Amino acid sequence: MPDNRIMLRIKDEFYLTELTQEVFDEVEIKMLRLAMSPVITQAELDSALCGWDIHKAGSKGQTIAFNISKTHPEVSFPKEYLNVLHRIGLSCRERYLTILPHFVKVIKVLEAKGLDFIILKGGAMRVYRPDYPRWTADIDILVPGSHYKKALDIFKNKGYSLFKSIHSTGLKDPATGQSLVDIHRFVGIGTIKAKRLSRELAGRALTLKFSSTTAIVPCPEDMVFISLVNFWKNVTDITSENSMANLCFDLKFLKDYSGGLNWDIVRSDARTTDTVEALYISKRLLEAVLPDFFPEGFIDEDIDSSKLRKLISRTRYTRNSISILRDFSLLGAIKNASSLSQYFFYRVKFFFVKRFHLMFDKDC
């Protein structure tokens, strides 16, 4: 079976290599590779941290360091890093304690009303690892089919403010305006075939004890699939840096928890939802930090090279557009006319790429 990567253009191969270096810097790659080892030595950690300053690092680097401190108690970080690590742990705990009562309440209400549901993403990881101090911005819960609207009516009557999007509705605390729980009618993975996944998730879901109730979560393989697609989305949209870091540790846990993943399930999910190419991009990026995670040749034989090239173009244009639009300032445009023309060029491109997923197959 030929390796489909050789069917990519040189510029696409170069971009994937370049993108890996944009997503993870050199020290982050060293730390993540080290963190995936069963046991690490103090000398190995000190070597990886050489020249790195946690106070100047972004949220991704700090989150990686925090996870290492929790998963590898056999090593210790420099004393000047401990305040930052403690602050991260405190933030995780405070946020979780804010969300937990609503999390449990929503589960109990859905159970009492006989509505089907599955906990997704970070919320599901909290069910799998209730004592692990993981940052959880909000809880994502899948309530598919006709049960979706019934659930929204129930929570609206219970006083929650609703914030609707295409695939989900956020429940906000009316007192604080904070987002607490997202109710999904289907898993938001960026394709029109996403609805097909709901039935597959339900058929393999696990029921686990959680707090004072039980919760239904995707099996480890389905969790891995959703995580990989979300990783590609986060990379493309330049969002959730700490989520990208957490995802690496989530993947390792899920593989260890299952005692060995059934990769045919992950492939089946990708084919069902038409996200094979997105998984391939995630795999290529994550191989730099999780070299032994994926089986050899995973997903390669399912790749449509033409679709992959288009998706790489979409990823490239979206990232470039977001960077330019985010950093644009009128004062800068006055000083530099080329930045103004670049702004409008990418604004038009970004409109079409995001809304109609047109794949502009040209050099940036």
Model-inferred region functions:
Residues 2-137, 143-364:
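Conserved NTP-donor binding/palm subdomain of two-metal-ion nucleotidyltransferases/polymerases, i.e.
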